[in-house]
């Protein structure tokens, strides 16, 4: 199972998750939520990327949570996450 991703966790190019659940915390950090913007990490599609996939079964505040392997609209995927929380 992939690790849960959180606000500030990054994709392989360094773009970071910008949307976190205000009331759901993992390892002291807000849980990353689907359809999050990703910080700009290059030109073209990398300057306005959003997440395109998330856990199909785990939700926070009614929104699917992000995890390592969650895709981004620029073609990258999330590569950072919680060291000890895993989600399907």
Regions found by a protein language model. Give the residues of each.
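Intrinsically disordered, low-complexity proline/glycine-rich segments
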Residues: 2-88
């Amino acid at each position: 199972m992939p690790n849960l991703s959180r606000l500030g966790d990054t994709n392989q190019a360094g773009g970071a998750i910008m949307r976190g659940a205000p009331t759901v915390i993992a390892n002291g950090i807000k849980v990353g939520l689907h359809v999050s913007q990703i910080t700009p990490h290059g030109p073209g599609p990398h300057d306005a990327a959003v997440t395109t996939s998330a856990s199909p079964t785990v939700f926070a505040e009614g929104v699917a949570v992000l995890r390592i392997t969650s895709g981004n609209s620029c073609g990258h995927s999330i590569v950072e996450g919680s060291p000890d929380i895993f989600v399907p």
